[in-house]
């Protein structure tokens, strides 16, 4: 047990940094920490309550008696008290006397552990002492270039992926969940899991997006060290862990951050800025230095103490705009007369600089649903400083397109190609998330038009296109085997569907697609540059066909062809970059995936210009399908033989006897190495694209 330092000045630095907005590890100072004082075991408690007249600690240890353990004001707004006899798991709250002389009972904002809802007290907990086994993962991660690495994310909600006791709604704890999850993730080929928020929250129906405990993994699924074990086990299995993290707002629950000491403390005091009325939640005061320290410390805590590999920051757009979901008269302009939330922008820049400055190999992912510029550019260059952003525009366009009856897809072809106008403006993740399979939106499979067979064909086509499109990938649980009904957080997924051929075959397709993606650098190594992508057929809207190349850093290519129409296309011709044989390596219409088995095998390129190339191939495109074909390497020119060289030499003219002749040899031709395919980087022709 730690020996508590007695000298008050020992706390001067963390307090100073806290008040400057620069304490990135405020959790080490605030909250409850087991220690010894004068040889007596107990815990020291510290809390920030700037408007409080008095604060005391209450709990089982003093029968919840206000004033029995009063706290001392260390400095302006910060209260402290050592309580002897406190033990691990003791439940406590802060009893705060407000400026109006009312008593409010508050959970500890910095608590590491909490009671399980409906109870809401904080628990004393020591997170030290766990022996990590993920040293190999951490070492490899520190060398990893996350931008130019494969990333196929499996998004899940911890309580409803599977359940320990479905009849009674009993979930697995974190460690048990890891044991169930790891074999599935490895078999399916995902690189990361992303958990919906596990920071403590009171209301199950919020899915974790209304947080009351920014330093506590939800006790629904076990103790903090159970969650440490979850991350550790996944890392040892070679699987990354991303957490959803919510700095955009917090709920009004009376025991939480709302009006913490009887006055606005964590929330913006301006009613036109401090509340999301549509959500019924409060907005953080991003201009308050102590709130900055609180939030950045929370983010750093999960990265540093729980070894998570990235944070997906929720609802960034709501932070950036003062008029977000607000009517005229419900918001006010910033000091420059604009609608941008300048304090929130500065906070996000500071947050990302702090995390990525210390851990450049981690991921800071923005869920930003507008066209805000430079989201994934460094703060030093005027950006927000994230290194990834969800591509919500692509998601909306493609789901709208896929829901369209194929008879009318020709008129909506621009929804397939439009994303390439901006695909390389940010470091995008392509998200098919939980938000798209709830609230009457239908499951992904049920969004697809057509009969039973066509729904699966459409979905396989979409998954094939998604995996080939530039950007990292994210798929919500259940969609990879064709969950038919919407997600319900109270129930596990319908795993019994895997007893049906079509669902099992769809799952096999996604599995093979994931492994093919990971094994094919052309699909991920140059995700954020035109150098990694090349159109071949962008504008065949009449037949709803597109074709393009993906290219890795060494120039190796994969040809991708998508037919979004339920019509068989025989002898469909397209230009190709190199002569030689093109081998079909993955076909969504393969019988083993539930298709009709219309395949191409190997096709040989024929001479004849098309689509800007000197040769072309002819394919059979199955109805509703995505095809992947290997591209042969460019041929090196044949080395010239001696007699060829002699034949190529021009005859020397007869030398004039009256003139001095100087023999000159022609300059040698430039070395012809491996010929690169002609670069055709152009975007889809505007005249032929419907947007």
List the predicted regions and their residue ranges:
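C-terminal beta-strand-rich structural cap/linker in extracellular carbohydrate-active enzymes
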Residues: 88-92, 601-636
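Conserved, mostly hydrophobic/aromatic
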Residues: 47, 94, 156, 185, ...
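Short proline/glycine-enriched turn/loop motifs at strand-loop junctions of beta-rich domains
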Residues: 48-55, 577-580
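Conserved alpha/beta catalytic core and glycan-binding cleft of carbohydrate-active enzymes
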Residues: 307-309, 324-490, 497, 518-589, ...
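Substrate-binding/active-site clefts of carbohydrate-active enzymes
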Residues: 115, 135-151, 157-340, 619
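Intrinsically disordered, polybasic Lys/Arg-rich low-complexity tracts
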Residues: 635-691
């Amino acid at each position: 047990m730690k020996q508590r330092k007695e000298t008050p000045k020992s706390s001067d630095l963390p307090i100073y940094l806290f008040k400057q907005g620069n304490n990135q590890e405020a959790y080490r100072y605030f909250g409850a920490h087991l220690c010894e004082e004068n040889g007596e075991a107990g815990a020291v408690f510290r809390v920030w309550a700037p408007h409080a007249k008095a604060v005391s600690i209450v709990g089982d240890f003093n029968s919840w008696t206000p004033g029995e353990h009063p706290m001392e004001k260390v400095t302006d707004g910060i209260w402290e008290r050592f309580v002897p006899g406190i033990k691990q798991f003791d439940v406590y709250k802060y009893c705060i006397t407000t400026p109006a002389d009312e008593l409010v009972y508050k959970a500890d904002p910095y608590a590491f552990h909490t009671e399980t809802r409906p109870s809401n007290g904080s628990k004393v907990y020591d997170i030290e002492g766990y022996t990590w086994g993920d040293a190999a993962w951490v070492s490899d991660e520190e060398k990893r270039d996350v931008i130019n690495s494969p990333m196929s994310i499996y998004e899940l909600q911890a309580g409803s992926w599977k359940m320990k006791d479905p009849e009674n709604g009993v979930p697995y704890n974190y460690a048990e969940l890891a044991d169930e999850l790891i074999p599935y993730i490895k078999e399916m080929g995902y690189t990361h899991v992303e958990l919906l928020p596990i920071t403590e929250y009171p209301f199950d129906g919020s899915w974790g997006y209304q947080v009351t405990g920014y330093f506590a993994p939800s006790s629904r699924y076990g103790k903090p060290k159970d969650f440490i074990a979850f991350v550790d086990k996944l890392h040892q299995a070679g699987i990354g862990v991303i957490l959803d993290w919510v700095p955009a707002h917090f709920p009004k629950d009376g025991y939480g951050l709302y009006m913490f000491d009887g006055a606005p403390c964590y929330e913006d005091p301006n009613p036109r800025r401090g509340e999301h009325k549509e959500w019924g939640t409060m907005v953080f005061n991003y201009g308050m230095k102590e709130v900055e320290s609180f939030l950045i410390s929370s983010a750093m805590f999960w990265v540093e103490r729980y070894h998570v590999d990235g944070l997906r920051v929720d609802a960034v757009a709501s932070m950036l705009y003062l008029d977000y979901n607000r009517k005229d008269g419900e918001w006010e302009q910033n000091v420059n007369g604009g609608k941008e939330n300048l304090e929130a922008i500065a906070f996000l820049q500071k947050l990302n600089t702090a995390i990525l400055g210390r851990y450049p190999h981690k991921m800071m992912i923005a869920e930003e649903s507008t066209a805000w510029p430079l989201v994934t550019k460094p703060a030093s260059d005027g950006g927000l400083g994230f290194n990834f952003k969800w591509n919500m525009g692509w998601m909306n366009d493609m789901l709208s397109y896929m829901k369209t009856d194929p008879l009318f897809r020709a008129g909506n072809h621009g929804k397939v190609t439009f994303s390439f106008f901006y695909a390389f403006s940010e470091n995008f993740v392509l998200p098919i998330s939980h938000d798209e399979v709830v609230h009457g939106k239908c499951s992904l499979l049920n969004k697809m038009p057509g009969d039973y067979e066509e729904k699966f064909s459409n979905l396989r086509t979409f998954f094939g296109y998604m995996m080939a499109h530039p950007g990292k990938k994210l798929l919500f649980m259940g969609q990879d085997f064709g969950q038919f009904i919407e997600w319900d957080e109270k129930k596990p997924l319908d795993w019994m569907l895997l007893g049906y051929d079509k669902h099992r075959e769809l799952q096999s397709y996604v599995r093979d697609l994931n492994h093919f993606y990971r094994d094919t650098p052309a699909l991920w190594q140059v995700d954020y540059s035109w150098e990694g992508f090349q159109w071949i057929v962008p504008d065949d809207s009449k037949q709803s066909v597109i074709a393009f190349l993906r290219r890795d850093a060494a120039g190796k290519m994969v040809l991708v062809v998508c037919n979004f129409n339920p019509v068989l296309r025989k002898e469909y011709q397209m230009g190709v970059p190199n002569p030689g044989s093109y081998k079909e390596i993955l076909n969504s219409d393969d019988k083993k995936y539930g298709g009709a088995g219309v395949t191409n095998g190997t096709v040989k390129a024929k001479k004849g210009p098309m689509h800007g190339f000197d040769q072309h191939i002819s394919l059979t495109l199955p109805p509703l399908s995505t095809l992947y074909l290997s591209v042969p390497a460019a041929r090196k020119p044949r080395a010239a033989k001696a007699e060829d060289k002699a034949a190529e030499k021009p005859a020397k003219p007869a030398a004039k006897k009256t003139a001095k002749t100087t023999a000159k040899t022609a300059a040698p031709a430039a070395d012809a190495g491996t010929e690169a395919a002609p670069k055709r980087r152009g975007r889809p022709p505007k005249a032929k694209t419907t947007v």
